């Protein structure tokens, strides 16, 4: 029963009902209908917040890209998204555009939110990616959620040192050492 409430909640959240939660539903059981049978009914609880019963659309999207070392920032538009990036920009706009599943004006879906965050993380060039949602006040549109994406670039080089004990085919055991260096953003464009 809990899984069904979660499934319904997820369906609603993917149809714009961003604030809907499984806890807003309850089961009513009737055992008087027939012997050894239970009639279940799924209802909304009486005190569900009004914001949970309203579908939301995506409002303004702002992407803030920061480097480890602070520098001057550029602001530009990419499709309908405002991007604020510190120079030098370490990702190509085309690649950044492909990672954004949310678009202004569309119904807000949690799947698109998760997909955007996952794809940005999988690029492997960011130390952290945070996606925040801000509801607008009633003057600009009470059914709109602004999206802010904050991503901080990671160090371009990573080094790892591994030590181990190895055994050869002649039954001799000896020390082993491995030093690895990897460049997370070799061409400085965010390529995978």
Show which residues each predicted segment covers:
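Periplasmic polypeptide-binding modules associated with outer-membrane biogenesis and secretion
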Residues: 1-167, 176-180
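Short loop/turn motifs that connect adjacent beta-strands in outer-membrane beta-barrel proteins
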Residues: 51-54, 186-192
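Short sequence motifs at beta-strands and strand-loop junctions characteristic
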Residues: 171-173
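Residues immediately flanking
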Residues: 183
């Amino acid at each position: 029963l809990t899984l069904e409430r979660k499934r319904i909640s997820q369906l609603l959240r993917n149809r714009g009902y961003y604030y809907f939660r499984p806890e807003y539903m309850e089961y009513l059981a009737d055992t008087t209908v027939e012997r050894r049978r239970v009639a279940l009914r799924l209802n909304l609880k009486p005190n569900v917040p009004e914001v949970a019963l309203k579908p939301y659309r995506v409002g303004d999207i702002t992407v803030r890209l920061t480097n480890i070392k602070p520098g001057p920032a550029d602001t530009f538009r990419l499709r309908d998204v405002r991007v604020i990036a510190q120079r030098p920009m370490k990702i190509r706009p085309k690649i950044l555009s492909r990672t954004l599943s949310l678009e202004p004006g569309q119904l807000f879906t949690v799947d698109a939110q998760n997909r955007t965050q996952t794809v940005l993380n999988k690029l492997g060039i960011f130390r952290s990616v945070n996606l925040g949602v801000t509801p607008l006040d009633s003057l600009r549109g009470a059914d709109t959620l602004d999206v802010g994406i904050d991503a901080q670039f990671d160090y371009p080089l990573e080094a790892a040192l591994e030590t181990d004990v190895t055994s050869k085919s002649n039954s001799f055991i000896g020390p082993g050492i491995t030093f690895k260096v990897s460049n997370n953003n070799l061409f400085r464009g965010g390529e995978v």
